[in-house]
Amino acid sequence: MTSTMTSDKVESFLEVVREHESPIRIYPEQTAFISKKLQFDWKEVIEGHFEGDDGHKNFVVHDCGSKESSFVYFGSQKWKLAKIHFHRRSEHLLESKQSKDGSFDAEIHFIHAPVKEPIETGDKMIEPSENLVIGTFVVESSTGAKSDELMSFFSACESGEKSVRMPLEIIKQVTKLEHFYFYRGSLTTKPYSENISWVVFESPLQLDKTVLDPICPTTQEARKGQPWNRRFVLRNFQ
């Protein structure tokens, strides 16, 4: 005898069995210290294009070969930058002087795929995940970055340009960040697969409001915070 389940019932069942979901609210006092580094090898030129429907658009990074691609080193692995997407309010929540009840003005997710290449980083930990996602908060600031390059980058989402360069200002700000929180979770959009290692930086990027406003057509709907359950959330700073 076979049984059938409607999509609604399947979704309800998965809501019960899921235990390692994202995003989460980060409580700094409940995190544990771990000596861990993330090393950037991002190039100054990162090109790609926007694709997807409104409400679920990604900046897809063009594959330009192993020498010109952008990578990070985390754990005992090398990860290649593949996609970037944006949320006009942050998905992760973190109590901070620059947040409002834990929420920031925006959040950017830099999605990296594992590279099957032996490397030596000094860190023996292998991440049991299909992707490493680096999350950076963003705050509106009157002294934040503002440039024609930043404006044209987000405007390109609507223009349909086939090749767009990621603003150097974003690359410079992100690659200077050091302090982060780390946990294992899920995609924040369907199918919410629990195969993501998350690095969420403590300090936000500073951008001018006029830069953030054009982000709206590219943004993905923010998912509500999920319970920690029995997970550890770690930090790499004292």
Which residues are covered by each model-predicted region?
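Alpha-carbonic anhydrase
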Residues: 1-238
